[in-house]
Amino acid sequence: MIHISDAAQAHFAKLLANQEEGTQIRVFVINPGTPNAECGVSYCPPDAVEASDTALKFDLLTAYVDELSAPYLEDAEIDFVTDQLGSQLTLKAPNAKMRKVADDAPLMERVEYMLQSQINPQLAGHGGRVSLMEITDEGYAILQFGGGCNGCSMVDVTLKEGIEKQLLNEFPELKGVRDLTEHQRGEHSYY
């Protein structure tokens, strides 16, 4: 469910050493399955453990996950990265905003999942997003861009060199992607 790197475990163990005996960590998702989902880590004293929690035992600690958050933390990774600028704890949870879909789910659901979990987080750095409008009978994914992508001069490159390549690599049954967006350049456009 969740992978916690050795460096992150050591970081948590150091923090937990200063807490009440028996205190562990809790990993959770607020507003799971929505565009506003946010992940977090907190201390979990012994009296805060619920019977319905999942206990994930690691070498240096135990991480508790509540029943509601569990499916949205599938494939989550926690790491502690140190570079010349300092140290940082990172939590990546690709399924926090949308529950992972089965490999045999309809093509529309699998494409939508990939857009939400892999493509949109990349576009969000520029204030953009993409939505799947339909998949045609001919096998084309019809997409609509929004936010900073609408009117951006790089949208064609993003569509063909980024999104289309990733989708065709993952879903060979697709023939390509098409952009439905009526692009209007403005203050919102990234480039």
Swiss-Prot record:
Cofactor mode of binding and number, as noted: Binds 1 [4Fe-4S] cluster per subunit. The cluster is presumably bound at the interface of two monomers.
Needed co-factor(s): [4Fe-4S] cluster
Protein's job: Involved in iron-sulfur cluster biogenesis. Binds a 4Fe-4S cluster, can transfer this cluster to apoproteins, and thereby intervenes in the maturation of Fe/S proteins. Could also act as a scaffold/chaperone for damaged Fe/S proteins.
Alphabetically ordered keywords of this record: 4Fe-4S, Iron, Iron-sulfur, Metal-binding
GO BP, sorted A to Z: iron-sulfur cluster assembly; protein maturation
One Pfam family in the UniProt entry: NifU
Gene name for this UniProt entry: nfuA
Subunit structure: Homodimer.
UniProt cross-references to NCBIfam families, sorted A to Z: PRK11190.1, YhgI_GntY
Residues in coiled coil: none
Protein name, UniProt field: Fe/S biogenesis protein NfuA
Family note: Belongs to the NfuA family.
Residues at which [4Fe-4S] cluster binds: C149, C152
SUPFAM superfamilies, A to Z: Fe-S cluster assembly (FSCA) domain-like, HesB-like domain
InterPro entries: Fe/S_biogenesis_protein_NfuA (IPR017726), FeS_biogenesis (IPR000361), FSCA_dom_sf (IPR034904), HesB-like_dom_sf (IPR035903), NIF_FeS_clus_asmbl_NifU_C (IPR001075)
Molecular function per GO: 4 iron, 4 sulfur cluster binding; iron ion binding
PANTHER family in alphabetical order: FE_S BIOGENESIS PROTEIN NFUA, IRON-SULFUR CLUSTER SCAFFOLD PROTEIN NFU-RELATED
